Curated annotation (Swiss-Prot):
Protein's recorded name: Potassium channel toxin alpha-KTx 4.2
Presence of keyword Phosphoprotein: no
Keywords tagged on the record: Calcium-activated potassium channel impairing toxin, Disulfide bond, Ion channel impairing toxin, Neurotoxin, Potassium channel impairing toxin, Secreted, Signal, Toxin, Voltage-gated potassium channel impairing toxin, Voltage-gated sodium channel impairing toxin
Recorded GO CC terms: extracellular region
Sequence similarity: Belongs to the short scorpion toxin superfamily. Potassium channel inhibitor family. Alpha-KTx 04 subfamily.
UniProt-recorded Gene Ontology molecular function terms: ion channel inhibitor activity; potassium channel regulator activity; sodium channel regulator activity; toxin activity
Species in which this protein is naturally found: Tityus serrulatus
Length: 57
């Protein structure tokens, strides 16, 4: 049972590391499509979202 908890903790830590690879840029936005061109230049992918008036790539 302890092995299961150990594997679960490792999985959660790895997931948190992978999910925190977003890049917050200083461009102001009002909706997500405003971020697509800036994220394409910065990261290479046109995926981004507008969070609290800032672009997250």
């Amino acid at each position: 049972m302890k092995v299961l908890y150990g594997i679960l903790i490792i999985f959660i830590l790895c997931s948190m590391f992978y999910l925190s690879q977003e890049v917050v840029i200083g461009q102001r936005c009002y909706r997500s499509p405003d971020c697509y061109s800036a994220c394409k230049k910065l990261v290479g992918k046109a995926t981004g979202k507008c969070t609290n008036g800032r672009c997250d790539c």
